[in-house]
């Protein structure tokens, strides 16, 4: 009995040791892409195209599952154990946090893919109701009495952090001082009636529930709202200054290694840079980093924007610490 038990234990250990290898060499693969809220439609289109490409290239079938939510909350879920093969989040800091706090991928993850691992970009625009009844044209109009601004919570939403920094950057550029920027953002937040936990929730609050006069929105969310509900319902206002948002992607090495999906996970992200990946990004209202690969009519939809960049504000590590960490400027302003 002891011998039989030991043999069973040895067999179990061998099976466990070779499970990832067997999984990787089989004909059935699965990936989990943990993403931020507004990428749902993009990856609903992209995933079957990648699966078709991978099947033709390797003979392996791959199923891609999606998880969506506020970018900061999604990063925390991966840190806490959610087995994401890849992450496609709203901002670099959230993937940095996964690397730093969990060790599941290296700190230099941005060097592994082109353009600092950002296959597409976006920006922040204003979505207003048709006819723009409050006459909202630029950031200064958002702090006028009687204007309700909808934006999500920057403690959980990556889009909200881009919104906040776009507003801060505008005020810093116009007012010329940190005090001016802080005063402007303080007045802006007083006009925010509710903070949804994620960007899609904020969009639904504005579009479906009819709350607010203006939505601070990802550009792709604004276009999507007009596409789904019609140009007779909403219109886009492009402010004089906005921020260039560059959502990054990364393989979560420790998970992919454990599940035997490293090769397909890398290929999945690399395919975002392919002609088809860039076409799909533009078709779903993301700015492709290689616009020459996308359809010209899709690229032509994007307005010219006077961009500020995250590096103009010290980079993500500094911005997170200054504004969004516990006790940062957001807590100081909103908690008063």
Where are these regions (language model features)?
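N-terminal signal peptide c-region/cleavage motif recognized by signal peptidases
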Residues: 19-21
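Short beta-strand->loop
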Residues: 34-36, 128-130, 148-174, 188-192, ...
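Periplasmic-binding protein-like
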Residues: 118-123, 184-189, 196-197, 229-262, ...
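Short helix-loop capping/hinge motifs at secondary-structure junctions, enriched
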Residues: 131-137, 156, 169-177, 255-263
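Extracellular/periplasmic juxtamembrane helices and adjacent flexible linkers that interface
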Residues: 256-336
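Ligand-binding pocket segment of bilobal, Venus flytrap-like solute-binding proteins
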Residues: 174-240
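N-terminal export leaders
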Residues: 7-11
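N-terminal segment of the mature folded domain
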Residues: 26-156, 296-299, 334-335
């Amino acid at each position: 009995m002891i011998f039989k038990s030991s043999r069973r234990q040895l067999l179990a250990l061998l099976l466990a040791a070779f499970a990832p290898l067997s999984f990787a060499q089989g004909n059935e693969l699965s990936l989990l892409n943990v993403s931020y809220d507004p990428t749902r439609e993009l990856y609903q289109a992209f995933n079957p195209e990648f699966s078709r490409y991978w099947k033709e290239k390797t003979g392996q079938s791959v199923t891609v599952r999606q998880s969506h939510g506020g970018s900061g909350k999604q990063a925390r879920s991966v840190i806490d154990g959610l087995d994401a093969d890849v992450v496609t989040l709203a901002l670099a800091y959230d993937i940095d946090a996964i690397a730093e706090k969990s060790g599941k991928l290296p700190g230099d993850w941005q060097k592994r893919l082109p353009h600092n691992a950002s296959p597409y970009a976006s920006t922040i625009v204003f979505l207003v109701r048709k006819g723009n009844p409050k006459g909202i044209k630029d950031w200064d109009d958002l702090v006028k009495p009687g204007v309700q601004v909808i934006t999500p919570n920057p403690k959980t939403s990556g889009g909200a952090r881009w919104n906040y920094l776009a507003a801060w950057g505008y005020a810093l550029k116009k007012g010329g001082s940190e005090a001016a920027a802080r005063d402007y953002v303080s007045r802006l937040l007083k006009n925010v009636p509710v903070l949804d936990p994620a960007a899609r929730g904020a969009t639904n609050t504005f579009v479906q529930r009819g709350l607010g006069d203006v939505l601070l929105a990802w550009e792709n969310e604004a276009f999507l709202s007009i596409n789904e509900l019609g140009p007779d319902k909403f219109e886009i206002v492009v402010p004089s200054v906005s921020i260039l948002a560059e959502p990054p992607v990364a393989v979560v090495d420790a998970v992919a290694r454990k599940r035997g999906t490293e090769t397909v996970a890398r290929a999945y992200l690399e395919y975002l840079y392919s002609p088809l990946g860039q076409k799909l990004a533009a078709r779903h209202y993301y700015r492709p980093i290689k616009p020459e690969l996308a359809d010209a009519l899709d690229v032509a939809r994007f307005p010219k924007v006077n961009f500020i960049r995250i590096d103009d504000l010290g980079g993500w590590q500094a911005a997170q610490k200054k504004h969004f960490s516990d006790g940062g400027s957001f807590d100081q302003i909103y908690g008063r």
